[in-house]
Amino acid sequence: MVHGMGFRDRKHLCYWGRIPKVLESQGANVFFGHQDAVGSVEGNADIIAKSLDEVLKITGAPKVNILAHSKGGLESRYLYNHGYSDKIASITTIDTPHHGSKTVDFLMRAPKWMVKVAAKGNDVWHKMLGDKHPDSYACFDILTTKTAEQFNIDNPTPDNILCQSYGFKCKGSFSDSVFCLTYPLVRKFDGDNDGMVSTDSMRWADFKGVRTSTTHRGISHADVVDMRRMRFTKKTPSADNEISDIVPFYVEVVKGLKELGY
C-alpha cells in the first residue's frame, strides 16, 4: 500500500486506518511503501523500490499488487516504468491526480520566489518529522497540468499488467471540514472533487467510476484512507456508486484481484 503526499507510514498511527488489519484478517499480506511525505516522485519511487524488494525477500512472492492513494499512484507508475515492470503484478490507484490540477496551475502563478520560500519552509518541517529528502516544490510541480501531461508521456500505461483506477467525491464544501476551503476552490477550476483532486484527474487506465457515500457528506480525500477510523453512516447504499464504509471497498478490490489471479 502506497500512501499519498503529506504523510508517512508510521507504526502507531497508520495512514490507512482500519484497512490493513481488516485485509490481513481476510488473508492478505499487507506491506507499505515507506516513502517520504513530500519527496519527489523520482526520489520516493527509489524508496518504494527498496520496500518492494524487501517484501519479495520476506514473502518469496515473484510480484506484488500495488494499491496507491493520491500522489502514491504517480510514484507507483514511475516505479513500474523505471526498472520494476517484472516485479509488479497490478497497480490500483485511488484518487490519484493523473492529469494534474488547474487549481494548482492557478496557485503556481504566484511569484516563483514566493512558491520556493513556501516549499522550503514545508521541507524544513517535514525534515523534522522524518523525511530524508523532502522536495515540496517538486510535489507542487507534478500537480500542474503541464508537468502531468509530460509525466503521462514519459510513463505510459502498462499494457501487460492489470491497471485500474477508482474515484471518490464530496457533495459540497461542508462534506468534510478539513477541506471546506479547498473543495470550492478545486470545484471552481476543476469541477467535482474529493476536496483535493478532481474526478476528471482521477481517471486512468481501466477507470472503475466515481463513488460517494449514502449521506449528504460524500467521501473526501481523507475519508478514502479511513482517517476517521469509522464508517460514514449506518444507512444502506441505494445505488451501485454509494458506500457506507470505506473498509469493505478495499476488501472488494483485493477480492477482485484475487479472483482474477493476482
PLM segments and residue spans:
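A conserved mid-domain beta-alpha-beta active-site/ligand-binding segment of alpha/beta enzyme cores
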Residues: 130-175
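Hydrophobic/aromatic beta-strand patches that form the interior of the parallel beta-sheet core
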Residues: 31, 92, 164-166
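Serine-dependent carboxylesterase/thioesterase catalytic core
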Residues: 3, 45-148, 194
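Solvent-exposed loop/turn segments at secondary-structure junctions
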Residues: 5-8, 36-39, 71-74, 96-100, ...
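Short, flexible/disordered intra-domain loops and linkers
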Residues: 9-14, 109, 236-238
